[in-house]
Amino acid sequence: MEERRVVEAAPAATVVLLRDGEAGIEVLLGRRSSRLDFHGGAWVFPGGRIDPEDYADRPDDAEGAARRCAVREAKEEAGLDVDPDALVHLSSWTTPEIAPKRFATWFFIGPVAGGVEEADGTETEALRWFR
């Protein structure tokens, strides 16, 4: 039997964005482009890979890099501003070793600080607030 190679998990961050809606608290989800090979067409929270720049010359600050990534992804994918200090670390998990693509993801939750919501049209096709 051939031994299967385990793919290294890429560091990533996701942000669960909240706002006060007319009928109560709402959460933002974006529909991933159907052209993407990883969960194309799925409704997801904004997020993505942690870039080297997210470490801001602090290679040992994994949580800080993840926060900066979450803020950046909210802006890139949804046009929304997020205060990194208002984010709460919700959870972290890593995709199982059997998956062909793996991520070690930091999950944050926090309020939207401003901006105009707009799907980027590349990774995210649509945005919707859910209650």
Protein language model regions, located:
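N-terminal leader/linker segments that precede catalytic domains of diphosphate-processing enzymes
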Residues: 1-131
